[in-house]
């Protein structure tokens, strides 16, 4: 038993495409989701959005925080009502060309503040700025320096909203175990170590993604890899 264990959790994204396609999740399906989650009793939820299906209209470049809000609001309400900690974030910038855009930083943080402070969803405790930024499938393509710079800019923008900054911290670096992008200088442990060195005060919780197979788990190799990564996390911080 570990006091650092936060419980089992789930990835629960808010069906971004469904609303945009005019095929919203039905009330019956929401009831089924609630019933299943009631049984699971997750300790936390990771909720990621695609901004072009939410606050950013790619056709016009317009920012609209009320756009396609219903399903995200319903998901967060369930988490709020049931005391579930949420790590919320964005898979990628609105367009890949905006991966280092201050416009994205400002829109994204304003939207986060809207969710947490205006709508009252302070179940959101952590904010993820890129999904798996070490991956060659990400807009960052393993560029640690770009990711670090954006993390610093996001944190600085969050500081402009004092209530938000008090309630929400970064979850990082959100990288993939057992993977090394040839374009990146660092492996998983290296990303965690460098982010701790460069952003230790800004990161509230450290997170990595793991996709282990049965043999890796049963052989003990997976636990050993986790120990190596955990060793890079500063004392007093969770992974």
Outline where the language-model segments fall:
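Distinct, well-ordered alpha-helical segments
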Residues: 108-111, 180-199, 218, 222-226
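Non-catalytic accessory regions flanking glycosidase/transglycosidase catalytic cores in CAZymes
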Residues: 1-126, 135-136, 141, 145-179, ...
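Short beta-strand->loop
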Residues: 88, 208-209
């Amino acid at each position: 038993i570990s006091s650092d264990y936060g419980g089992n959790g789930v990835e629960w994204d808010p069906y971004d495409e469904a609303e945009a396609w005019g095929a919203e999740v039905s009330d019956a399906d929401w009831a089924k989701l609630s019933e299943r989650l009631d049984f699971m009793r997750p300790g936390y939820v990771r909720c990621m959005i695609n901004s072009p299906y939410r606050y950013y209209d790619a056709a016009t470049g317009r920012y609209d925080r009320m756009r396609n809000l219903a399903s995200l609001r319903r998901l967060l309400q369930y988490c709020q009502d049931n005391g579930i900690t949420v790590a919320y974030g964005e898979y990628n910038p609105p367009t890949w060309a905006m991966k280092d855009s201050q416009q994205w930083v400002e829109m994204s943080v304003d939207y986060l503040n809207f969710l947490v402070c205006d709508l009252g969803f302070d179940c959101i405790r952590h904010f993820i700025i890129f999904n798996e930024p070490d991956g060659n499938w990400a807009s960052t393509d393993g560029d640690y320096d770009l990711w670090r710079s954006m993390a610093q800019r996001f944190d600085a923008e969050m500081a402009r909203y004092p209530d938000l900054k008090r309630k929400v911290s970064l979850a990082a670096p959100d990288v993939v175990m057992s993977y090394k992008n040839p374009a990146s200088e660092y492996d998983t442990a290296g990303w965690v170590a460098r982010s701790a060195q460069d952003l230790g005060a800004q990161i509230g919780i450290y997170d990595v993604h793991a996709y282990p197979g049965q043999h890796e788990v049963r052989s003990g190799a997976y636990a050993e890899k986790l120990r190596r990564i955990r060793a890079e996390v500063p004392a007093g911080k969770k992974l």
